[in-house]
Amino acid sequence: LRGGAQIGVQVDTLASAVHSGQFGGAAPDAAKALMRAIDSLSDEYGRTVIDGVDTTAEWSGQEYPAEAFRADAQLLEGTKIMGEDDPAGATPVANMVWSRPAITVTGFTSTPVSEAVNAVPATASAQLNLRVPAGADAAAIADAVCDHLRAHTPWGAHVKAEVLEANAGFATDPEKPAAALLGECLTEAYGTDTAAQGMGGSIPLTTELQEAHPNAEIALYGVEEPKCTIHSANESVDPTEIENIAA
C-alpha cells in the first residue's frame, strides 16, 4: 500500500485581477505561473520528478502489463501512458505505480469558466495528492515537493506551499508464516500461483496497527476491481466480488 500526502499550493502575482486588454501580455498571470510550477513536477515524458528525491526505483514483483493498465485505467484511444514515449524504452507501469512517488492534481482554482472575464488572474491555487511507495518517508517527500514548487514558480510570483497531511505506506513480508499460509490457501482456492503485486491505495490504520503490534502479521482483502472507479462519482462494487472472496 502506498503512503501519501495532501499538499496545498497558492500563487499570487497581482494585488487584483487587471484588464487583459490593457495589461495582458506583460502582467504575470497567476494561473499560468501555477501551471508552470506544477508542470515542472513531470519530465518531458510525463514521469514524476521532484528535486532531491529519487524517482527512478524499480519494482521487483509481478509486472503490470501496459495493455492491462490501459484497460484498467480506461485510457482514451490514443492517450499515452506516462513514460511510454521515452526513446530509451517505455518505463514499466509497475515502477511508476508501486515503486516511485506520484503526484496528481486533485483540485485547481482560479477564475471558474462559468465566470470567465477578460482579466489577468491575480491568484490561483491547487491541491496535489502525493503517493509514495511503502517504506518511503511521506512527510519528507511532501516537504521536498513544497520546496520544488517554491523553486520552480516563475516570474517572481509569490508562492505558498504547505503539507496538509501525510501518512505512511505499508508492506507485509510474504515470507512470514501467516502470510505464506494465506498465499498457499489462495493458490489452492483459485488454482493458480499467488503473485506479489502493489496495490496503490493508502490505509494509514495498517501502519498504526503494525507499530502497536510489531510481531503481528496483517493481511487485508479488497473486494473492488478497476471498474469500481473508487473515489469517482460512479463508484460501485459488484456484490458477486464479495461473494467470491468469501467463498
What kind of feature is each model-predicted range?
Residues 14-16, 110-112, 131-135, 166, ...:
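Short, glycine-/Ser/Thr-/acidic-enriched flexible segments
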Residues 169-188:
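Short, low-order "capping/linker" segments at domain edges
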Residues 87, 91-119, 129:
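A structural supersecondary motif
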Residues 5, 124-126:
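Hydrophobic core residues within well-ordered beta-strands of beta-rich domains
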Residues 10, 34, 108, 120-124, ...:
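Zn-dependent metallopeptidase/amidohydrolase metal-coordination segment
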Residues 141-150:
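Short amphipathic alpha-helices in soluble, non-transmembrane regions
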Residues 1-85, 94-101, 212, 234-243:
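Fold-level recognition of mixed alpha/beta catalytic cores in primary-metabolism enzymes, strongest
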Residues 130-133, 159-175:
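A short beta-alpha structural unit
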